[in-house]
């Protein structure tokens, strides 16, 4: 399954795991709930630097992620399979680059 949309990028990825055990638990939990209400699809901590550098260099940038598991499904007691196969994510990224190259050539 593929999704396109907003992803939260932060500097404390592991703050989302057991946030109630952290000194700023109230803040972490409230921020995550706010991101969910805004339609955020996932959380990660690598892409922000790429987008900053791309903006500075005035070049396009994009990101493709493999969502390994869904902590929200887990909290609800739903099936939460863990994915490790990166093949689909790689194919999506390659196809996106092909489309950009084609558009640039037109």
Identify the role of each PLM range.
Residues 1-106:
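Glycine-rich phosphate- or other oxyanion-binding loops that anchor nucleotides, phosphorylated ligands
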